[in-house]
């Protein structure tokens, strides 16, 4: 028995991407944006295929991502930001709602929506995941978006 395997390729040449980034913890967000843009360009895309939307914080990411997704102008939405644990339970609420909200946007709109939002215990961990020791999670989120766009085109 031969099973047909369908998977996405890593070709960004003919796709349009919206980056939706939280301005809270902006210097981390900017590093994630740089990683996402680098990924798209390395995989055949260009900066002309990318639009950058900035929102106040991680809680606003899902609503902006949905507005962008339903516009029909983009093949994928890449959400980026950093939620860093503080002394109160605010972190848990924002991290959970941002995660659930972004996931729901993908289900509601049926276009790829990826999650490049860091949820870390401290600033050092966020810096590590925004381009130092642990790679750049913005790059990773863009890579997933590229693959998902190409997979969706085959379904």
From Swiss-Prot:
Belongs to the DMRL synthase family. CDD domains: Lumazine_synthase-I. GO terms for molecular function: 6,7-dimethyl-8-ribityllumazine synthase activity. 5-amino-6-(D-ribitylamino)uracil binds at residues 24, 58-60, 82-84, 115. GO terms for biological process: riboflavin biosynthetic process. It is an enzyme of class 2 (transferase). It holds the Pfam family DMRL_synthase. One of its GO terms (cellular component) is cytosol. It comes from Prosthecochloris aestuarii (strain DSM 271 / SK 413). (2S)-2-hydroxy-3-oxobutyl phosphate binds at residues 87-88, 129. The active site is at residue 90. This is 6,7-dimethyl-8-ribityllumazine synthase.
């Amino acid at each position: 028995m031969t099973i047909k395997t369908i998977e996405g390729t890593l070709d960004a040449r003919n796709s349009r991407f919206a980056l939706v980034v939280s301005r809270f913890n902006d210097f981390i967000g900017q590093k994630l944006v740089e990683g996402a843009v680098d990924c798209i360009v390395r995989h055949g895309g260009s900066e002309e295929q990318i639009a950058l939307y900035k929102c106040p914080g991680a809680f606003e990411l899902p609503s902006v991502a949905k507005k962008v997704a339903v516009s029909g102008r983009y093949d994928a939405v890449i959400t980026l930001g950093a939620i860093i644990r503080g002394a109160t339970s605010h972190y848990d609420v924002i991290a959970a709602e941002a995660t659930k909200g972004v996931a729901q946007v993908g289900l509601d709109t049926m276009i790829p929506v990826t999650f490049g939002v860091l949820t870390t215990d401290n600033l050092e961990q966020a810096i590590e995941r925004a381009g130092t020791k642990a790679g750049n999670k913005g790059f990773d989120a863009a890579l997933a978006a590229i693959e998902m766009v190409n997979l969706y085109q085959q379904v």
